[in-house]
């Protein structure tokens, strides 16, 4: 099968935005106008084409980026719908990695919102060219020029309007195209017919003013145009378009469009702008990779002639075809039924079938070409971020980096039948999502799941129930405390049972001392003259090790202590290993009153990134969580606060930070060291654990 669309006529785009800016509705309309959907689905009725997981329809938010193929004016447009919620930023990063360009959707009433900042920063990191669509122009309080202003003020983006709305709120009737210098009025409800007319008299002056500032901004990025402009020559429409395209592709300029996806106005013009201003795979720099054997850097150009290379950016379990691996082809071609090498894992994989996805239906294709996005069926070992390549010409494309999970919750199956299913379900979910981890706590035997936030874990538990039919109880998050001794002492442990017949006799003297942090348990045998026979020494050590596991204060493991066995006595008949084991554990219990045992807690290294104006609130909040601020620095237009905070105080922090900063703050944390718990807090924990 020959290539249907040339590389120059291919666009891989993402649609990114804050929650509820109208991203899914915009995607819907794009699919409607490109002829892939017959009936328009409304998100607020829970019937959208792109949001196809049940919980997405219920919550009205988009979680998985469904990759969809559409056609417009002889071009192929691959669209990746991305989530706009903080807990799902990994999905966004994942999509941005494989896109060539993006449409940022703003709400005309609010302009740039908190999550827009986060997603915008991520897009800048990956160097993704963007056009901006100011949506919801029909909403009360909609203000187009205010929204354009927020792009400049809050994101320092060189953004300029290339359109102007005619009217606003209920009177939003049409759109003025500042590049072509015409006005579009919509004739029917579905917005399929719009006629280009002359700009209405009352808008002429404003339109001319905005068009002139647009031309100036474009000329500043292009010397030839600047010279022409300064000499007073007219800039033609084609030159203006070429200038906007050049600035956009260099990520130096952001054209801003306007409309209302819900009212079917302006979406076709967004599609035209995608073709006019966003890059084809050939406009993007060649992707860099390394040879697995020599680590030498190599490039793969976007061409069918080059060896095959692709990046897997999403793994999903589909109820009908099993495991689907979404991938972006960077170079070469791939036929279904052929073999490829997963160079990241060093495994050979067979591509059973190749599907091109349309929101929730699929079409089987025989070949994918450079620049395409498709899903493969039949890959066994491939996970998110892996490179797939030609077996004869290996390359590892730079992978994606995923943040560490920040929240842990204990989970247990409701019944025995759920137990086995739960293990399988968790393993499959962890395979799909690199920011979700699962482990079994060896001390409590609980299954612990970890993720990026409370909503993230809620949805995981919800998916277990719906997709895998597993019912589970979710506990409150737990902290792994430890215990240790602060002072040393010599203690006796004596176990004697002699009441006729064979008795029990074990007697030891042990000196306990605190050990260095992280050094663990050390046992020393200092018996002289056989007062405790050699064969009983290992029993003394084993008795201590068992007793340490259960602690002395609140049942948490006792760590970092030294024990020296220096004296004791035995009985010819009644002594045995068991008796010495018990004697050793009694010695440890007797040490409680003399060795000043304390409780230790994990201390997390926390880094919070926030806009300057929230600095005071955040510092106060960290202090109230028993945290110590270690340092601060400016990073771009944000502030970074570094602090040490006990894990026990960090539960619910993601939610608190979100509300303290209107969602504009982000944080990362990882375990740093153990530290003594303050007395008042320790007493509470001990009481709770002893069930008092």
From Swiss-Prot:
Indicate whether Nucleotide-binding appears among the record's keywords: yes
* Segments crossing the lipid bilayer: none
Predominant location category = cytoplasm
Sample GO molecular function, one term: GTP binding
Q: Which Gene3D superfamilies match?
A: 3.30.230.10, 3.30.70.240, Elongation Factor G (Translational Gtpase), domain 3 (3.30.70.870), P-loop containing nucleotide triphosphate hydrolases (3.40.50.300), Translation factors (2.40.30.10)
| Protein family | Belongs to the TRAFAC class translation factor GTPase superfamily. Classic translation factor GTPase family. EF-G/EF-2 subfamily.
Q: What is this protein called?
A: Elongation factor G
